[in-house]
């Protein structure tokens, strides 16, 4: 009898896979392995946090170093951009009912403050509190009549701008000042006056003025030496003439034969 179809199918089906035998848990194997895996996971998380913090610190240090390497112009430009963003943010926060005139005034004020800050950054070594362009009022009053006062700073003579005007100022002041050159305190006053005159100049101009004063000093020394030599020659000549004139040129004509003694007195 021929085998049935079902028998063929049963014979041709693959054998079932072997059963998986679960690993037996030993007595000494408890939950430590599970805890170790958890600890390892926690350690990995801590390490990742540390690495992230280190990377953030390194990035911050690099940013600070890059900021320090930036030029002054770059830093100023960044500050201008920050102020611009801040002004725009403030503008967006303002009440929508703000009129156009008030908005323009606020923007002008913000721009002016930014320009002032920009100037301070460029000229940080300069004292902006001193207003060099506007001289102080120099008022001279009469002690006998205080109502009679003159503001010298308002006179055109004391506001020179051209070379000729400075020359005129010099020709006016020099005679007034040098008239006191023979007074005891004039030399000390001249030193302090010169220091005050050159105080606002740069080092190059001060050096030129010092060189000019050195030249004048050398010329004065030569003149004084020549004058000393002339005085010595004059004194020597006067001394010689006085010695010659003081000699007694009279002839001694006194008779010494008639001395009131006779020859017999020695006998």
From Swiss-Prot:
Any GO BP annotation: formation of cytoplasmic translation initiation complex
Record keywords, A-Z: Coiled coil, Cytoplasm, Initiation factor, Protein biosynthesis
Compositionally biased tracts (Basic and acidic residues): 74-88, 108-118, 221-231
Region (Disordered): 1-118, 221-241
Localization annotation: Cytoplasm
Gene3D superfamilies registered for this protein in UniProt: Eukaryotic translation initiation factor 3 like domains (1.10.246.60)
Pfam family, one: eIF3_subunit
Positions in coiled-coil regions: 44-99
Superkingdom in the source lineage: Eukaryota
Keyword Ion transport: no
Primary location group: cytoplasm
MF (Gene Ontology): translation initiation factor activity
Subunit structure, interactors included: Component of the eukaryotic translation initiation factor 3 (eIF-3) complex.
Functional description taken from the UniProt entry: Component of the eukaryotic translation initiation factor 3 (eIF-3) complex, which is involved in protein synthesis of a specialized repertoire of mRNAs and, together with other initiation factors, stimulates binding of mRNA and methionyl-tRNAi to the 40S ribosome. The eIF-3 complex specifically targets and initiates translation of a subset of mRNAs involved in cell proliferation.
Record family assignment: Belongs to the eIF-3 subunit J family.
Protein's name according to its UniProt entry: Eukaryotic translation initiation factor 3 subunit J
Origin species: Aspergillus fumigatus (strain ATCC MYA-4609 / CBS 101355 / FGSC A1100 / Af293)
Lineage: Eukaryota, Fungi, Dikarya, Ascomycota, Pezizomycotina
Gene: hcr1
């Amino acid at each position: 009898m021929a085998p049935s179809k079902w028998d063929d199918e049963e014979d041709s089906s693959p054998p079932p896979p072997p059963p998986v035998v679960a690993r037996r848990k030993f007595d000494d194997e408890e939950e430590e392995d599970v805890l170790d895996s958890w600890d390892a996971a926690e350690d990995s998380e801590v390490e990742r946090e540390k690495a992230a913090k280190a990377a953030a610190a390194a990035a911050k240090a690099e940013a600070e170093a890059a900021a320090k390497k930036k030029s002054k112009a770059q830093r100023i430009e960044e500050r201008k951009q920050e102020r611009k963003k801040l002004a725009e943010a403030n503008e967006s926060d303002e009440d929508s009912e703000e009129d156009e005139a008030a908005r323009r005034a606020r923007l002008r004020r913000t721009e002016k403050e930014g320009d002032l800050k920009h100037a301070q950054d460029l000229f940080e070594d300069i004292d902006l509190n001193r207003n060099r362009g506007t001289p102080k009022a120099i008022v001279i009053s009469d002690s006998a009549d205080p109502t009679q006062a003159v503001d010298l700073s308002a006179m055109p003579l004391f506001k020179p701008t051209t070379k000729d005007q400075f020359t005129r100022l010099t020709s006016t002041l020099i005679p007034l000042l040098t008239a006191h050159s023979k007074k005891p305190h004039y030399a000390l006053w001249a030193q302090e006056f010169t220091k005050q005159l050159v105080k606002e100049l740069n080092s190059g101009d001060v050096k030129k003025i010092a060189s000019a004063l050195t030249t004048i000093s050398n010329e004065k020394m030569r003149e004084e030496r020549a004058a000393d030599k002339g005085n010595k020659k004059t004194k020597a000549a006067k001394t010689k003439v006085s010695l010659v004139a003081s000699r007694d040129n009279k002839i001694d004509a006194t008779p010494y034969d008639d001395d009131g003694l006779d020859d017999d007195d020695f006998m």
